[in-house]
């Protein structure tokens, strides 16, 4: 008797790394139940679209992805941040099978079961121990918590994903250990607010190996640093206790890299954003961090054109950047988000002014980035290889996260492998990237 073909699911994952982890968890569950992944919508039994709802532009991208899936397949399940407020999706595509918000894995699976029941053979082991991942084999996102207790005026993430809910330390460490055992060389620690990790658990201890570990930012970072992989910290708010992790970076336990979303520097704008406003103290802290860990790389994001931002505020930001010397910077033009308190603020900025300020900010940062990178010429850096070409390999230094930061382009006398970590001599630098030669393996 011929066995029925396994049902096939096409999957679209939009938005941030936190959403990508949600997608990985859903796909892992589906594969465990015997579902296969389809490369095309039209060859699948149904399509799952994991949406982003943070900005209106992201919502439009999500709606377009749903529309493409409806046109190509017709059987579509929608999940993710935009699904937390389903009215817009229902109005545009009343024929979708199901709409759920973020992290609602069981609801997504139930919708899949209703549309196309599984044909799982319990004798088959369909899922590797570390689960299914959508990133390359050599790096993985490690999500340590969900939600956020902050109430920034421009953000609706707490409305979409709720307040902070941290995973226990042993749960995070078990996942990290499995990833490293499966060949992951770099763990990218993510959440909505990484440095607040464990606050909701009151820093509860959990057993790990022959000891107990607190659910606390510094303790978790220290334990992750013992696993033998690069550990990169993202979405770190500059709370006072963040100073403690700089020592781990100086010791080489975790990468000398901090992704801190400062968003602005002007105290007046930060107050309107409902963000911490002591940026003069932040500059002092950055100087101390770099004194304690000279190799520290800082990444941050900034919003220009926020309601009420004056030319004086913007100039303050430019001057602050000159002094802070942020290594890697992402800039966004303020965009109203449905449901965000900032929509009601007076003195909204015109699109022309937003664009002009964004251009000036990026031009200033280009100069800063080039200056920072030029200092690395002649040094030796460890590089993790992401891509291998016929003559040049592309990788990243400890100062570069995948997708969002710069690259290092290397020539080598012998073939390189993706995921390999090599030592390179840096020969030259441009505004955002480095170029060098492999000097050791």
UniProtKB/Swiss-Prot annotation:
Gene3D superfamilies (UniProt xref): Methylthiotransferase, N-terminal domain, Nucleic acid-binding proteins, tm_1862 like domain
Iron as a keyword? yes
What GO terms in the biological process aspect are recorded for it? Answer: tRNA modification
Naming one, the record's GO cellular component terms include: cytosol
The organism sits in which domain of life? Bacteria
What catalytic reaction does the record list? L-aspartate(89)-[ribosomal protein uS12]-hydrogen + (sulfur carrier)-SH + AH2 + 2 S-adenosyl-L-methionine = 3-methylsulfanyl-L-aspartate(89)-[ribosomal protein uS12]-hydrogen + (sulfur carrier)-H + 5'-deoxyadenosine + L-methionine + A + S-adenosyl-L-homocysteine + 2 H(+)
Q: Which SUPFAM superfamilies match?
A: Radical SAM enzymes (SSF102114)
Entry's transmembrane regions: none
Q: Where does [4Fe-4S] cluster 2 bind?
A: 148, 152, 155
Query: Per UniProt, what is one GO molecular function of this protein?
Result: protein methylthiotransferase activity
Grouped into one coarse class, the protein's main location is: cytoplasm
Ranges of residues in domain TRAM = 374-440
Pfam families, per this entry?
A: Radical_SAM (PF04055), TRAM_2 (PF18693), UPF0004 (PF00919)
- Location of the MTTase N-terminal domain: 7-117
| Signal peptide interval | none
Q: How is the cofactor bound?
A: Binds 2 [4Fe-4S] clusters. One cluster is coordinated with 3 cysteines and an exchangeable S-adenosyl-L-methionine.
Question: Where along this sequence does the record place binding of [4Fe-4S] cluster 1?
Answer: 16, 52, 81
Q: Name the needed cofactors.
A: [4Fe-4S] cluster
Describe its function. Catalyzes the methylthiolation of an aspartic acid residue of ribosomal protein uS12.
Write down the PANTHER family for this protein, in alphabetical order. RIBOSOMAL PROTEIN S12 METHYLTHIOTRANSFERASE RIMO, RIBOSOMAL PROTEIN US12 METHYLTHIOTRANSFERASE RIMO
The UniProt similarity line reads: Belongs to the methylthiotransferase family. RimO subfamily.
This protein is called Ribosomal protein uS12 methylthiotransferase RimO
Native species of this protein?
Answer: Rhodopseudomonas palustris (strain BisB5)
